[in-house]
Amino acid sequence: MAGFRSLARQVRDTRCDLALRRYSLRKCLERFAPYGHRATWDHLCARHSIEPEDRAPDPARLVAALDELEQARAVWLAYEEGFADRRKREKHDGLRRPAAIDDWHRRTWGGNGVARCDSPGAHPSAPLDEVLRRLISALEDGPRAACPVCEETHIVWRQDLANEPWFGPVCAGCGIVVPQPVLTSEAVAAAKRAGRQELASVA
């Protein structure tokens, strides 16, 4: 199975036909897709003016989309390296029990779904690397009352997410499933109330 870097080389390889280069970019998303596969593809297509179903898109646009994905991946891999070093130090110091953020991190190792968007068409519009930097800052700074990506305070708890963790707080502004460790307990409680109110309004 080809890795991310091998697939990225195929995307850039002008000897390959455009259908294969597009396919290779889609396969890259099986290795790294911050919003989830479909939402990350929708994001890249929107930002780089690629028709999602076009089998022979402009090669310059394909490469620009890959560049954005690679920049975001570099940001995330650097964070993961620092995270792994921190856990090693903590274990060496006798701190074996992982924190809530560590449990969340285990589910997103590799960067897949790190800022998952439950609806493929609802995702942040900013460049992927910028979104990940905001998220990483929030993970390092501690809990807050607003979405770490767009600062929206209207966050709604959903019980019917399409992917793991299957339930959680969803930002009404940018569409990400907000990692619970970055929200205060009051913000999580408010999101659950908002979720119950939405359910009651459609009952």
Where are these predicted regions, by residue range?
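Cys/His-rich microdomains that often coordinate metals
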Residues: 154-155, 178
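Charged, low-complexity interaction regions
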Residues: 12-20, 35-37, 52-56, 114-122
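Residues immediately within or flanking Cys/His clusters that coordinate Zn2+
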Residues: 140-144, 166-168
